[in-house]
């Protein structure tokens, strides 16, 4: 997964730079989300990866999916990906693109994993603390993961803050076995 993100990052940066320059970040965002969903569909992906399909035929398939929403720039981008056998990276490119878009809008997307559901008050306290820490607006999504036993794991981009009981037990286990 990390390797795919590494490969996808330059494509996402180039797409975002172009879209920003053209004032079309939302249009590109929509197109990349649709294309990402298409590539993740097993039947479509199997058809797309048939050896007899040329890169231009692959791009034509995407043109049919996007319909009138496909600009010439998106078509050129897809051609570049198809020519380099990188269409499989579309989900990662879309993810990286959205990350760049959030950074540009000074918004940090945060995923909070908690052993138990958080109350609205707890969510608000965490949101306020994270906005202060990152000095920007924060959007929070909460996932309940009972395996954590207690505590939370906070993920913001590449940063992870793990204050879960599971993590603390693992650290104790490592120390005892060392």
UniProtKB/Swiss-Prot annotation:
The keyword Ion transport applies. GO terms for molecular function: proton-transporting ATP synthase activity, rotational mechanism. GO terms for cellular component: plasma membrane; proton-transporting ATP synthase complex. It holds the Pfam family OSCP. Its main location: membrane. Keywords: ATP synthesis, Cell inner membrane, Cell membrane, CF(1), Hydrogen ion transport, Ion transport, Membrane, Transport. It is found in: Cell inner membrane. It comes from the Bacteria. InterPro entries: ATP_synth_OSCP/delta_N_sf, ATPase_OSCP/d_CS, ATPase_OSCP/dsu. It is a peripheral membrane protein. F(1)F(0) ATP synthase produces ATP from ADP in the presence of a proton or sodium gradient. F-type ATPases consist of two structural domains, F(1) containing the extramembraneous catalytic core and F(0) containing the membrane proton channel, linked together by a central stalk and a peripheral stalk. During catalysis, ATP synthesis in the catalytic domain of F(1) is coupled via a rotary mechanism of the central stalk subunits to proton translocation. F-type ATPases have 2 components, F(1) - the catalytic core - and F(0) - the membrane proton channel. F(1) has five subunits: alpha(3), beta(3), gamma(1), delta(1), epsilon(1). F(0) has three main subunits: a(1), b(2) and c(10-14). The alpha and beta chains form an alternating ring which encloses part of the gamma chain. F(1) is attached to F(0) by a central stalk formed by the gamma and epsilon chains, while a peripheral stalk is formed by the delta and b chains. Belongs to the ATPase delta chain family. HAMAP family: ATP_synth_delta_bact. This is ATP synthase subunit delta.
